[in-house]
């Protein structure tokens, strides 16, 4: 008897998920493998991917358009949270996994499957994200993980697929593993596994090099309402169009490349190359607007919780209780994050040159000015300083007595 009768497999068209199809049927006795591929704006022609799954032995090959919920329900919360894992990575890949897992469970329910499957290996982050999300959403569903259990090297995996007529997808000329969606691209493997090897220009597709970026700078304005980006240069755009336009503008000027050593959930360090031009641009502008519209104690507390929010998403805990509680805090802070931020884009950098909020700014010129319009009561400072410094004076006096 097989491990499951009917399985819905999260499918990307890559080598691991393609080999999963014959492996599930031949080695684990699964009768019916249905694949699900998510359209997250990666730009691939999905019909060839759908057909590839059928050619590999899938009984059905489904494709779901998830672009709009991906941006509205996953990318926008990350922008509101200024989510940067380890202070740098804006979670472009990690944000996609809970959405795919959610839809995978829904498809499994629709077709009456008794299990779901994915092609994640045993040393990556995605296995954690999928397994934990599925367990939270559908604890009764089995999760089959052939790529984690089959013990084959990449070369052996490709050879196994060739036995069932699957073409080898990676050549010696292009040894990189690439994951992409509308938010960005992640590139790893091959020569990049040596952290001293500079990434060649051929691995980038969304951004120009600094050398190829225009010599002239460009100023843009990004508008926000309740913490969400809503327009660029005075033009209101829907969420998907906003991301596309931000990707275009930032990419032209060489903004959005990351080369970092990151700490994976499973405890190892990995070298990752990312392109996330639009997402990084929005987070930078959003942070700047918050500095204008949030009270000091709220801003400081939020900056601390942002790191925890990013950690939870990276670690696959999107559907967990702490992430849910932090969402409530993040959303509550965003009611006043309304306004416009102006940035100058030039040769790989985005520099804030202005920010304004008609109804939510906590910057009061009459209080901040040193000119004749100054309304700050300077005389009140003496009493404030006396009380503020009292604990320090008392502690210093005690130190002098003890010595």
From Swiss-Prot:
<dbReference type="GO" id="GO:0000050">
    <property type="term" value="P:urea cycle"/>
</dbReference>
<keyword id="KW-0963">Cytoplasm</keyword>
<dbReference type="InterPro" id="IPR024074">
    <property type="entry name" value="AS_cat/multimer_dom_body"/>
</dbReference>
<keyword id="KW-0028">Amino-acid biosynthesis</keyword>
<feature type="binding site">
    <location>
        <position position="129"/>
    </location>
    <ligand>
        <name>L-citrulline</name>
    </ligand>
</feature>
<feature type="binding site">
    <location>
        <position position="89"/>
    </location>
    <ligand>
        <name>L-citrulline</name>
    </ligand>
</feature>
<keyword id="KW-0067">ATP-binding</keyword>
<dbReference type="GO" id="GO:0000053">
    <property type="term" value="P:argininosuccinate metabolic process"/>
</dbReference>
<feature type="binding site">
    <location>
        <position position="262"/>
    </location>
    <ligand>
        <name>L-citrulline</name>
    </ligand>
</feature>
<feature type="binding site">
    <location>
        <position position="119"/>
    </location>
    <ligand>
        <name>ATP</name>
    </ligand>
</feature>
<dbReference type="Pfam" id="PF00764">
    <property type="entry name" value="Arginosuc_synth"/>
</dbReference>
<feature type="binding site">
    <location>
        <position position="38"/>
    </location>
    <ligand>
        <name>ATP</name>
    </ligand>
</feature>
<feature type="binding site">
    <location>
        <position position="125"/>
    </location>
    <ligand>
        <name>L-citrulline</name>
    </ligand>
</feature>
<protein>
    <recommendedName>
        <fullName>Argininosuccinate synthase</fullName>
        <ecNumber>6.3.4.5</ecNumber>
    </recommendedName>
</protein>
<dbReference type="InterPro" id="IPR048268">
    <property type="entry name" value="Arginosuc_syn_C"/>
</dbReference>
<dbReference type="GO" id="GO:0005524">
    <property type="term" value="F:ATP binding"/>
</dbReference>
<comment type="similarity">
    <text>Belongs to the argininosuccinate synthase family. Type 1 subfamily.</text>
</comment>
<dbReference type="GO" id="GO:0004055">
    <property type="term" value="F:argininosuccinate synthase activity"/>
</dbReference>
<dbReference type="InterPro" id="IPR014729">
    <property type="entry name" value="Rossmann-like_a/b/a_fold"/>
</dbReference>
<dbReference type="InterPro" id="IPR023434">
    <property type="entry name" value="Arginosuc_synth_type_1_subfam"/>
</dbReference>
<feature type="binding site">
    <location>
        <position position="125"/>
    </location>
    <ligand>
        <name>L-aspartate</name>
    </ligand>
</feature>
<feature type="binding site">
    <location>
        <position position="121"/>
    </location>
    <ligand>
        <name>L-aspartate</name>
    </ligand>
</feature>
<keyword id="KW-0055">Arginine biosynthesis</keyword>
<keyword id="KW-0436">Ligase</keyword>
<dbReference type="GO" id="GO:0006526">
    <property type="term" value="P:L-arginine biosynthetic process"/>
</dbReference>
<feature type="binding site">
    <location>
        <position position="186"/>
    </location>
    <ligand>
        <name>L-citrulline</name>
    </ligand>
</feature>
<feature type="binding site">
    <location>
        <position position="274"/>
    </location>
    <ligand>
        <name>L-citrulline</name>
    </ligand>
</feature>
<feature type="binding site">
    <location>
        <position position="126"/>
    </location>
    <ligand>
        <name>L-aspartate</name>
    </ligand>
</feature>
<feature type="binding site">
    <location>
        <position position="177"/>
    </location>
    <ligand>
        <name>L-citrulline</name>
    </ligand>
</feature>
<dbReference type="GO" id="GO:0005737">
    <property type="term" value="C:cytoplasm"/>
</dbReference>
<keyword id="KW-0547">Nucleotide-binding</keyword>
<dbReference type="InterPro" id="IPR001518">
    <property type="entry name" value="Arginosuc_synth"/>
</dbReference>
<comment type="pathway">
    <text>Amino-acid biosynthesis; L-arginine biosynthesis; L-arginine from L-ornithine and carbamoyl phosphate: step 2/3.</text>
</comment>
<feature type="binding site">
    <location>
        <begin position="10"/>
        <end position="18"/>
    </location>
    <ligand>
        <name>ATP</name>
    </ligand>
</feature>
<dbReference type="InterPro" id="IPR048267">
    <property type="entry name" value="Arginosuc_syn_N"/>
</dbReference>
<comment type="subunit">
    <text>Homotetramer.</text>
</comment>
<dbReference type="InterPro" id="IPR018223">
    <property type="entry name" value="Arginosuc_synth_CS"/>
</dbReference>
<dbReference type="Pfam" id="PF20979">
    <property type="entry name" value="Arginosuc_syn_C"/>
</dbReference>
């Amino acid at each position: 008897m097989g491990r499951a009768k009917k399985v819905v497999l999260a499918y990307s068209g890559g080598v691991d998920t393609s080999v999963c199809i014959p492996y599930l049927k031949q080695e684990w006795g699964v009768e019916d493998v249905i694949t699900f591929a998510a359209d997250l704006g990666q730009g691939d022609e999905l019909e060839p991917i759908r057909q590839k799954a059928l050619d590999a032995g899938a009984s059905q090959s489904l494709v779901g358009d998830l672009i709009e919920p991906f941006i509205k329900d996953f990318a926008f919360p990350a922008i509101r949270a200024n989510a940067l894992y380890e202070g740098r990575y804006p979670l472009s890949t990690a944000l996609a996994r809970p959405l795919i897992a959610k839809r995978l469970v829904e498809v499994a329910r629709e077709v009456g499957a008794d299990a779901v499957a994915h092609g994640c290996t045993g040393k990556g982050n995605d296995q954690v994200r999928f397994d934990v999300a599925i367990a939270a959403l559908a604890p009764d569903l089995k999760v089959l993980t052939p790529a984690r259990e089959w013990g084959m090297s990449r070369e052996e995996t490709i050879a196994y697929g060739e036995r069932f007529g699957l073409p080898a997808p990676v050549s010696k000329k292009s040894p990189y593993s690439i994951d992409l969606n509308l938010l960005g691209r992640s590139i790893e493997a091959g020569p990049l596994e040596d952290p001293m090897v500079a990434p060649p220009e051929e691995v980038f597709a969304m951004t120009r090099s600094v050398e190829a970026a225009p010599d002239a700078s460009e100023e843009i304005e990004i508008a926000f309402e309740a913490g969400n980006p809503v327009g660029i240069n005075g033009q209101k755009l829907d969420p998907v169009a906003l991301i596309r336009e931000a990707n275009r503008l930032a990419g032209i000027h060489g903004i959005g490349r990351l080369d970092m050593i990151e700490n994976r959930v499973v405890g190892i360090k990995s070298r990752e190359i990312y392109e996330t031009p639009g997402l990084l641009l929005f987070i930078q502008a959003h942070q700047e607007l918050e500095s204008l519209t949030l009270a000091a104690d709220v801003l400081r507390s939020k900056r601390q919780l942002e790191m925890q929010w990013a950690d939870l998403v990276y670690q696959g805990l999107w559907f967990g209780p702490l992430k849910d509680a932090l969402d409530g805090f993040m959303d509550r802070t965003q009611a006043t994050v309304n306004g416009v931020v102006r940035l100058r884009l030039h040769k790989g950098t985005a520099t804030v040159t202005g920010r304004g909020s008609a109804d939510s700014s906590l910057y009061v010129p009459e209080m901040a000015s040193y000119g004749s319009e100054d309304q700050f009561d300077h005389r009140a400072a003496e009493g404030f300083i006396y009380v503020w410094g009292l604990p320090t004076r008392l502690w210093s006096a005690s130190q002098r007595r003890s010595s």
